[in-house]
């Protein structure tokens, strides 16, 4: 019952508001929040959490000032340490595939295991490699745009999206 709506289009705020109103039991979050202005719009639209591809202290601070969880993006150990200093324990590993995939994430997570740091890899995660990520103890979630392609959304091909989500859930159950 969790969904992330990315701020990659002007329709994001409206989508968050519509989903939050239509499905009050669903936890709706805003992804790709890269400015404090987007953070304000996301929260005003009903977002219950936020994510970003990078670590920006102003955006993190804005979400924190509203008691709303925020997951900043990291790609290096220095990014991890910067996020920890800003009080973040849940981090988005992005772009996971291009950065080095599960092997890199395992190596980077190891020095921070005693600090309760958890990761959500996105960018390059697929049905073929998702369980490799999910097998890493420090991974709390994964993200994948393959679940709903732009073409499927544009064509309102909800049955294909539903089938892909069911396939991913079945695969994740084996992790």
Indicate residue ranges for each PLM-predicted region.
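Hydrophobic faces of well-ordered beta-strands that scaffold small-molecule active sites
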Residues: 3-5, 28-31, 50-51, 70-73, ...
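Catalytic cores of alpha/beta
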Residues: 35-45, 78-87, 109-110, 125-141
């Amino acid at each position: 019952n969790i969904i992330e709506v990315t701020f990659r289009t002007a329709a994001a705020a409206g989508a968050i508001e519509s989903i939050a109103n239509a499905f009050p039991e669903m936890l709706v979050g805003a992804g790709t929040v890269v400015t404090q202005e987007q953070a304000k719009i996301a929260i005003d639209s009903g977002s219950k959490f936020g994510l970003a591809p990078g670590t920006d202290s102003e955006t993190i601070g804005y979400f924190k000032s509203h008691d709303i969880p925020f997951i900043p993006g990291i790609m290096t150990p220095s990014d991890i340490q910067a996020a920890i200093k800003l009080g973040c324990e849940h981090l988005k590993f992005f772009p996971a595939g291009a950065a080095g995939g599960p092997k890199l994430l395992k190596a980077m997570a190891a020095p921070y295991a005693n600090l309760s740091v958890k990761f959500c890899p996105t960018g390059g995660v697929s049905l073929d490699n998702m369980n490799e990520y999910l097998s890493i103890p420090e991974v709390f979630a994964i993200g994948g745009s393959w679940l709903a392609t732009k073409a499927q959304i544009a064509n309102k091909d909800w049955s294909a999206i539903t089938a892909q989500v069911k396939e991913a859930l079945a695969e994740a159950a084996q992790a």
